[in-house]
Amino acid sequence: MASMVHQLKVEDFDEFKSVFDSDPVGRKEAAKGHVMSRSVDDPNVVFTRVEFDSLEAAKAFRDRLVASGALDQVTVLTAPTVVELVENVTY
């Protein structure tokens, strides 16, 4: 499985979430789903993982996201990075 991960610092989480949910870059058409987490130390630091069927789909979406300018409204702490699942262990 392929995913795109990134870490952002937002000014207002509720406003960010509203824009994210409006899906301005077409995430729902390209991806299988996503997981979003917030830092307990700073709830305006957001971690997002978006899951895709393939590395190619993840890379294409990452490129579209970067080109869209959607990230210009936030502070990017970790740039959108395409990753491949290596191991998933449950304890």
Task: Walk through the language-model features, giving the residues of each.
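Short S/T/G/P-rich N-terminal loop/turn motif that feeds into the first structured element of a domain
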Residues: 1-91
